[in-house]
Amino acid sequence: MTKNIKNTITVLCIALSCNHIDTFAQEYSKYLQAVDEYQPAPGQFVNELPEYELGDDAAAMAAKCTESLTTGGIVSLGGFGGYITFHFDHSISNVPGKRDLYISGNGYNGNSEPGIVMVMRDDNGNGLPDDTWYELAGSADTDSIGKVIYNYSITYTPNPMGNIPWTDNQGNSGEMKRNGYHQQEYFPAWIDTNLTFTGTRLPNNATNKGTDTQPYYFLTSLRYGYVDNASRTDTTACSFDISWAVDAERRPVTLDRIDFVRVYCAVNQQCGWIGETSTEITGAEDLHLTESLQSTAISSPIDDNADHNDIYSLSGHRRPAMVRGLNIIRNDRGEVRKVVVR
């Protein structure tokens, strides 16, 4: 006899959200699981953090980023536009009234290298970051009106072992200059074509508090909402609320959860002997793991009329195949079970 799929999934959800949610949470980690994409812009730490080795491609570099960020290391995103995309082993819930994500860099007072956070919900359920990105709007939207450049675009041109030329869509051009402290190639070594990035450009935040002959650059922190903008020990400054999400037109977007996170360097700035301003990232975590799992577990039920032998997310989206994390499987007898893919 075929069981009612809605009743079955509801029972499963209740089990997850009540008696067994704490045990279930032990199967998951609050820390990021893996890096999906690593595309830095040119910079003095590129090809070093992480280290490029001959033959590495984009996938190999992403794997090195995963290794670094899950073992206490650091990843540099280079200049404006350079980004990293990563995921957790579960969806992160947008908990009302709370910040949801902690993302750390290597910032400190006077050395803010702000990166913008973008988030994505896996709406098509395929486990890939190929749905719609939303920016988490930070304080510059209100504190620097008229100074933020939206839809800013920059193109870098390879110039092996030399300064890296760039042009932007504002009619400007310049160079990512080499310095004496880093002797490796500054352009990502696994790429041999122009690199173009588009995003929100924040105002320059560097002030020379020294002299022309003895410069001392102070990089002022923004009020909130950016990675590598403050010390990692300042958990409030390094925390982000999914409720800050906006679409491409800067309109607020309501997201119940997210599955992918992207951080990109949001300034195009050179600071003399210090070099370019480049966002770094050292880790990320879900600030409320149990609540994320519980919220996901009580999402909407699966359609009664679905075919057998199907795979679903807990929110009821049909999947073409199992993905990492929790999958709901209905077999040919109409029975439902959970399968966790690590």
Model-derived features: where do they sit?
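A domain-level signal for the mature, folded cores of soluble proteins
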Residues: F24-E113, G138-Q294
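Bacterial Sec-dependent N-terminal signal peptides
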Residues: M1-Q26, I298-S299
